[in-house]
Swiss-Prot record:
Residues 223-235 have a biased composition (Pro residues). It is found in: Endoplasmic reticulum membrane. This is Derlin-3. Residues 216-235 are annotated as: Disordered. It comes from Homo sapiens (Human).
């Protein structure tokens, strides 16, 4: 019964958050069970473009390291802030949310080439947190019961925490930079004098992922209208 309740609760999670979180957990579980090796997952441009191992363009965003404190810490923030974005500013805009993932992933991959970064999942997490924090500037965040501050400081607090754990902050900086580029192009520049929205979600994504817009001129059939329905007249 507990598993059924947990499964039912998980199915209530928005689709993109559910899919990405599940993919990360399953990838890590496969590595832990030695079904996969991290060497099969990391981003390597030579193997991608010369050996056509194109799955590495995706799998490097799914592996957050072996099971341990760092993995659960990252999964907590991925799940929480991905869900808050999907249920908040991207509510009813699944295609736009997926496009943000694609835009961020492509830009991180290109910039990651300069720094020889092999796994970019943590950068994607930092991007999600950054975009949420800029769209929720008045929200106060309690950081593990130790500090309370305004949401825009959260990405920097996470970067400092990574530094305390002995991790490189280059990945966090990359995620923050890409998150800022997305936020500027999507939320800031279109509202400037002479500005316009430069990021346009492709139509095929909207067709696949978003519910069709309702036609304001559509008149439902009598049997589709609310209220009691009279039986058709006898012939």
């Amino acid at each position: 019964m507990a598993w059924q309740g947990l499964a039912a609760e998980f199915l209530q999670v928005p689709a993109v958050t559910r899919a990405y979180t599940a993919a990360c957990v399953l990838t890590t579980a496969a590595v832990q069970l030695e079904l996969l090796s991290p060497f099969q997952l990391y981003f390597n441009p030579h193997l991608v473009f010369r050996k056509f191992q194109v799955w590495r363009l995706v799998t490097n965003f799914l592996f957050f390291g072996p099971l341990g404190f760092s993995f659960f810490f990252n999964m907590l923030f991925v799940f929480r802030y991905c869900r808050m974005l999907e249920e908040g500013s991207f509510r009813g805009r699944t295609a736009d949310f997926v496009f943000m993932f694609l835009f961020g992933g492509v830009l991180m991959t290109l910039l990651g080439l300069l720094g020889s970064l092999f796994f970019l999942g943590q950068a994607l997490m930092a991007m999600l947190v950054y975009v949420w924090s800029r769209r929720s500037p008045r929200v106060r965040v309690n950081f593990f019961g130790l500090l309370t501050f305004q949401a825009p400081f959260l990405p920097w607090a996470l970067m400092g925490f990574s530094l305390l754990l002995g991790n490189s902050i280059l990945v966090d900086l990359l995620g923050i930079a890409v998150g800022h580029i997305y936020y500027f192009l999507e939320d800031v520049f279109p509202n400037q004098p002479g500005g316009k929205r430069l990021l346009q979600t492709p139509g095929f994504l909207k067709l696949l992922l978003d519910a069709p817009a309702e036609d304001p001129n559509y008149l439902p059939l009598p049997e589709e209208q609310p209220g009691p329905h009279l039986p058709p007249p006898q012939q």
